[in-house]
């Protein structure tokens, strides 16, 4: 449905070149929810703006539903964009128009008659859970309701693709989840392809079938959500996965951490388990095998794409040789181990 082929985007500040996107290649299948995640400045918003040609790529092609958008005239592009809906972080509703009239706007611009508009807008407001808000104004709506209006408006022209640019980042967690559930329902009912840009791995975990990770304008890693969570290949992927788990180190431990091992200190380690390692009794195995005691300070377990993943912060109480052997054993069994320091 969406093919992004060798896309580059260069911005210029005077004589300085800024490479926002570098040789991006992505193929997004019809009917999927595809997430693109990256930190601020990674290039993800530039990428989604290239998909509907709000930003023209410096080189490369953008193919949507078999049409190369980079080769279209302005008139052809305007017509083709009706197949591409888009929602933003900041809703972009017209404050002087009612909910009904905001959703009706694209239909009015397309020259639809009043009966068609009435029927379509009523149907869409029911779909997004705002059947009782026809005559309300944006100022009287919550953030979540405003985003629902924006979603309904984006669907007014029956697009085949819905682009979501940080659509939940201005919302509280409960409202975010309700909007994500709505997007899943829309994907299921309308078979619409959704390309979603976010900086939150929780969003990817909740809704996406596949994900691409972008850093510094480059495609770092891509795959199904299950593959990325089970077998992350890059440090950036590990960082995003880590952000979905609630782990904290007690303040008194942080104050006692030493950068190197000294007499009377013990290693504090962070263990990352993915895929099969989650269910393996590795912690009890190293305790018996290397005769060390283990104090678990915090741990968390979650699911994404049908895959379990988890993390643990623990202190190892053994002699230096046994502690190091235990750490090596865990690494040999595909556990990512990070020594955070040594607790004195």
Swiss-Prot record:
Binding-site list for ATP: 38-45
Which ranges of the sequence are coiled-coil? none
Offer an example of a GO molecular function term for this protein. Answer: ATP hydrolysis activity
Q: Does the keyword Translocase apply?
A: yes
Q: Which reaction does it catalyse?
A: L-methionine(out) + ATP + H2O = L-methionine(in) + ADP + phosphate + H(+); D-methionine(out) + ATP + H2O = D-methionine(in) + ADP + phosphate + H(+)
Which cellular component, as a GO term, is one annotated location?
plasma membrane
Superkingdom to which the source organism belongs: Bacteria
Alphabetized InterPro entries for the sequence = AAA+_ATPase (IPR003593), ABC_MetN_proteobac (IPR012692), ABC_transporter-like_ATP-bd (IPR003439), ABC_transporter-like_CS (IPR017871), ACT-like_dom_sf (IPR045865), MetN_ABC (IPR041701), MetN_ABC_transporter-like (IPR050086), NIL_domain (IPR018449)
Membrane topology annotation: Peripheral membrane protein
Give the top-level enzyme category. Answer: translocase
* Assigned keywords, A-Z: Amino-acid transport, ATP-binding, Cell inner membrane, Cell membrane, Membrane, Nucleotide-binding, Translocase, Transport
Q: Where is the ABC transporter domain?
A: 2-241
Q: Where in the cell is it found?
A: Cell inner membrane
Known EC number(s)? 7.4.2.11
Q: Assembly and interactions? A: The complex is composed of two ATP-binding proteins (MetN), two transmembrane proteins (MetI) and a solute-binding protein (MetQ).
Database matches in NCBIfam families: ABC_MetN
Q: Quote the function comment for this protein.
A: Part of the ABC transporter complex MetNIQ involved in methionine import. Responsible for energy coupling to the transport system.
Name the protein family: Belongs to the ABC transporter superfamily. Methionine importer (TC 3.A.1.24) family.
Protein known as: Methionine import ATP-binding protein MetN
Question: What gene name is listed for this protein?
Answer: metN
């Amino acid at each position: 449905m969406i093919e992004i082929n060798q896309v580059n985007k260069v911005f210029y500040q005077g004589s300085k070149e800024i490479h926002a996107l570098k040789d991006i290649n992505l193929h997004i299948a019809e009917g999927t929810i595809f997430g693109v995640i990256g930190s601020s400045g990674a290039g993800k918003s530039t990428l989604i703006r290239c998909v509907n040609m709000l930003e023209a790529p410096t080189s490369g092609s953008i193919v949507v539903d078999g049409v190369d958008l980079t080769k279209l005239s302005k008139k052809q592009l305007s017509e083709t964009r009706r197949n591409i809906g888009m929602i933003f972080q900041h809703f972009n509703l017209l404050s002087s128009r009612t909910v009904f009239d905001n959703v009706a706007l694209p239909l009015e611009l397309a020259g639809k008659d009043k009966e068609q508009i009435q029927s379509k807008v009523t149907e869409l407001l029911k779909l997004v859970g705002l059947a009782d808000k026809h005559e309300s104004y944006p100022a009287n709506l919550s953030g979540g309701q405003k985003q629902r209006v924006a979603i309904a408006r984006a669907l007014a022209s029956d697009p085949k693709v819905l682009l979501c640019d940080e659509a939940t980042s201005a919302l509280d967690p409960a409202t975010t989840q309700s909007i994500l559930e709505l997007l899943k329902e829309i994907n299921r009912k309308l078979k619409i392809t959704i390309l979603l840009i976010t900086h939150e791995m929780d969003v990817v975990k909740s809704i996406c079938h596949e994900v691409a990770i972008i850093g510094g304008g480059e495609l770092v890693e891509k795959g199904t959500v299950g593959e990325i969570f089970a077998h992350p290949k890059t440090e950036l992927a590990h960082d995003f996965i880590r952000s979905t788990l609630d782990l904290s180190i007690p303040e008194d431990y942080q104050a006692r951490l030493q950068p190197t091992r000294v007499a009377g200190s013990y290693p504090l380690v962070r263990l990352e388990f993915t895929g099969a390692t989650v269910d393996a009794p590795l912690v009890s195995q190293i305790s018996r095998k290397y005769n060390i005691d283990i104090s678990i300070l915090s741990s968390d377990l979650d699911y994404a794409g049908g895959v379990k993943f988890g993390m643990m912060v623990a202190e190892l109480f053994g002699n230096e040789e046994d502690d190091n052997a235990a750490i090596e054993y865990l690494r040999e069994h595909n556990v990512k181990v990070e020594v955070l320091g040594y607790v004195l």
